Amino acid sequence: MISKIDKNKVRLKRHARVRTNLSGTAEKPRLNVYRSNKHIYAQIIDDNKGVTLAQASSKDSDIATTATKVELATKVGEAIAKKAADKGIKEIVFDRGGYLYHGRVKALAEAARESGLEF
């Protein structure tokens, strides 16, 4: 009997494989993206200290509106870039979380780039 492929399990394996070579430092922290069916979350993480430096999500009161999911991802990208700039962070390492660079993940990344983050 053929079993159905669990997309999230494959994504988690891909993310673990990529994370072996990808880490953030204090000078160049990691921008991590998590995508659920309804919301999108972004964190800027210093892996040396194990500390989250900034975060934004589509659940935040200033972002949450009745917009499409791609539009919300764009707003989250702009918000995380603004919070990073407030903390003095200009360069980051982009961690797409095992997701394809398409749709909401791409919209978040491009909005963060346009708002001043370099990666």
From Swiss-Prot:
GO terms for cellular component: cytosolic large ribosomal subunit. GO terms for molecular function: 5S rRNA binding; structural constituent of ribosome. InterPro entries: Ribosomal_uL18_bac-type (IPR004389), Ribosomal_uL18_bac/euk (IPR005484). Pfam families: Ribosomal_L18p. Keywords: Ribonucleoprotein, Ribosomal protein, RNA-binding, rRNA-binding. One of its GO terms (biological process) is translation. Belongs to the universal ribosomal protein uL18 family. NCBIfam families: L18_bact. Part of the 50S ribosomal subunit; part of the 5S rRNA/L5/L18/L25 subcomplex. Contacts the 5S and 23S rRNAs. This is one of the proteins that bind and probably mediate the attachment of the 5S RNA into the large ribosomal subunit, where it forms part of the central protuberance. This is Large ribosomal subunit protein uL18. It comes from Staphylococcus aureus (strain NCTC 8325 / PS 47).
